[in-house]
Amino acid sequence: MREITTGGVWTHTETMSGADAVALAQRIELLGYSTLWLPETAGKDPFALIGMLAANTTELRFATGIANIFHRHPGVMKQAAMTLAEQSGGR
């Protein structure tokens, strides 16, 4: 597991289009931030969104901060984490 460093950005994306979220992630990466935090409490599915954002960035790491254990079975959480880790090269 990689260490999550300082210099991250926490944001909500529920009002953004997918293209706007990609542009934001690319800008955050360009500015040198290490991590983009996306909450699960409102808006879009963070795991699906992270897959799209990871495909359009090269070094930016992603975190949910909160993943609601009452809405997601632990096995499904593991599947999502494993899939995203593979798709993003461990980011």
Show where each model-derived region lies.
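Flexible, glycine-rich active-site loops centered on histidine and acidic residues
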Residues: 2-16, 73-91
